Amino acid sequence: MSIAVGLSACALSSVLFGSMFVPVKKCHSGNGIFVQWIMSTAILLVGIVVYSTQGFPEFEPLAMLGGMFWALGNATAVPIMNTIGIGMGMLVWGTTNCVAGWAAGRFGLFGINSTVPEYPFLNYFGLVLVVFGGFLFSQIRPNEPQTASERSPLMVAPDDDLTDDVAPDDSDIVVPRGGAVPTRAHRNQKRLLAIITSLVAGVFYGFTFVPVIYIQDHPEIYPTAPKTGLGYVFSHYIGIFCTASALMIGYVIYSRNNPFASSRLVGPSMTAGSMWGIAQASWFVANDNLSQAVSFPIISMVPGVIAALWSVFYFRDISGSRNLRLLSIAVAITLIGAICVGVSK
């Protein structure tokens, strides 16, 4: 029964993680700081509901650190998504997410108990496949982002007035008033920066559970700590809300009280936050019923596959025989690697 519950939680978590940015992607979302702050309020509301269903267990301040890690990584999600698409973004950061989570458990980083795999060769072989799959993901060249909202004059700063001129060899690019056209080299630089940022974000995501695992591994230090994963959800989500609020305050100060904060983003961001809150709670349930060694590789990689399906069939971020062939091969290799890592333990 516990296996069925764990696998069901993995499935729910993967679908929600892989689909949560779809509502936001359809809107012009700026730099994503406002989006994340609205998401964090919805996440906190979900956390309050979970907290009440668990009988208001003891609050664990250390678990807030995991929420901070996630919020720092997620602060880059919208710019990444707007540059290389939700599918490629999630697949790339899912790779380092999986590797970071593997390293923390395998070597006992940050004071948690190390987990020695029963089949070391299979474990390392799976890790190599995950890394190689991540390399293949980086070779995919997504289409230039195109949304109607991004072209709307209402969404453009006064200094960025646009004309109807069109680049002769790239009809998708609107030419600024001065006539300058983004060069291919410039687009490649943005793409490379987005990939590097995705890799760094994945590391933050990979360490999200470390504080909770540390508490669970040291009952002598935390004798009254919750016994189940859901007992840490509220503490975890408070960390997210506080970090997102700090980033929002810093952004308001930096922009001199002129942040990008469109009212059109409130509904989609609340939806994304609610989906993430439920998905993360499901991940805690999966950890309790399957162990993190099994659930982590699944939930760190499958959402990227689901997001890639959105990119291919809905947003059309990824098209062309070369890209689709690379995507299919990379997904297959990465999933096989993640399965090997999970089975080896």
From Swiss-Prot:
Pfam families: TMEM144. GO terms for molecular function: carbohydrate transmembrane transporter activity. It is a multi-pass membrane protein. Its main location: membrane. InterPro entries: Sugar_transport, TMEM144. GO terms for cellular component: membrane. Keywords: Membrane, Transmembrane, Transmembrane helix. The chain crosses the membrane at residues 3-23, 32-52, 61-81, 84-104, 120-140, 193-213, 233-253, 265-285, 293-313, 324-344. It is found in: Membrane. Belongs to the TMEM144 family. This is Transmembrane protein 144 homolog.
